[in-house]
Amino acid sequence: SLRRRQRQMCIRDRIDVVSWDNYPTWHKEAEEVTALDAALQHDFMRSLMKKPFLLMESCPTSTNWQSVSKLKRPGLLKAASLQAVAHGSDSVQYFQIRQSRGASEKFHGAVIDHYGGKDTRVFREVTETGEALLDLAQIAGSTTKAQAAILHDCESRWAMEDAQGPRNMGLHYMNTVKKVYGGLRKLGVNVDFLDMEESLSGYRIVFAPMLYLFRAGIEEKIRNFVADGGTFVMTYWSGVVDENDLCFLGGTPHGLMDVFGLRSTELDALYDQDVNAGVGEGKTYEIRNFCDLVKTNGAETLLAYLSLIHISEPTRH
């Protein structure tokens, strides 16, 4: 899964097939929240090699190792399985086929339970899911074309989360990534995940949420991408350090201040209870965690902080 120990390029250079085990905590949060997280993980797996992956494990009913063993509601098995296929999986596989009588996974969900018959709800839903997959057999091996990409670079994340400051009680990096991803998916836009060693060409828009560390010549890639007509969206706390986690001198985002038409001057970290607001284009937006103070130099201001302390603005250039 999309965890901090992974580095995409190291993985894809050494493997032939990408697979993963998908065990969402369905019914804990709103279904659309859980579904969005699962979709993001699927797209990350597909993006590793830009080709279909394998869903190696999924549970036909409930696990036994999560904090609460919640049964999948009727119809959810089929929906979750088809979601995996829609995001690039060439398989839907289960753990486990038959429940064991003993040991640590004897109560883990299975296609065939201790009763052993075929006349169960779970067996029926597995059968219906299999029939639906048979109807979709012709799309096996097909690839997904994405016009949008998100830069998720593990080395940048490692460095950022190991830094002392600016918010040691939680940077909420993955929440930021999910907000970007969720916005694109609500628009029906397919999304690839990239690291900084990959090319940006072929995309219409690329997002860089909290790209703290710059490496692999990313500054030049971004500059060329924008010059060729692409749209690049970068958030606060980006371009702060080099590949050795040494702070850049001369201003941030390093090497791109002219591209974005601004310079980040200060970053204010907010307590959990702190709330600021951004006002612009007739709307007000809630702001939490960080307020990046910027000095513009050619960028168009779209949103202004409501707090008098935060005197600069998010911009477009």
Summary of predicted features, one role per range:
Residues R14, D37-M45, L76-A80, V122, ...:
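A general structural detector for well-ordered alpha-helical segments in enzyme core domains, enriched
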Residues Q6, R12-Q66, A80, D113, ...:
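Glycoside hydrolase catalytic-domain groove-lining segments
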Residues D119, R124-R204:
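Aromatic-Pro/Gly-enriched surface loop or interdomain linker
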Residues L2-I11, I309-H317:
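Single conserved hydrophobic/aromatic residue that forms the stacking wall/gate
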Residues N22, L55-T120, K145-R167, W237, ...:
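Aromatic/acidic polysaccharide-binding cleft in carbohydrate-active enzymes
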Residues P209-R316:
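A conserved amphipathic helix/loop scaffold
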